[in-house]
């Protein structure tokens, strides 16, 4: 598995979130198996998204396919993106 963490600023969180939700088809198309959305504590328009993929190819293909949609839903500037290979995952209750 692979994880991608992306951080970017948006014009208005509510507009971005609607567009993000409507692009569910794109996430499914590229094999995203898990997603979580986070906001910077002091700036709700500073977004961090975590996506897990079946493999690194899906993650990189997704990043290449997403830019047109990102502009439409209000992403400002270039995002910061990190890729990682999943080594271990533990759930605590």
Locations of the language-model features?
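An amphipathic, aromatic/His-enriched active-site/gating alpha helix that lines ligand/cofactor pockets
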Residues: 17-36, 52-85
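A short beta-turn/loop motif at secondary-structure boundaries
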Residues: 38-43
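Short, low-order "capping/linker" segments at domain edges
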Residues: 85-93
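Short, surface-exposed ligand-recognition loops at beta-strand->loop->(often short) alpha-helix junctions
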Residues: 9-19
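Short structural boundary motif marking the start of a folded domain
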Residues: 1-4
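Short hydrophobic/aromatic beta-strand micro-patches
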Residues: 7-9, 50-52
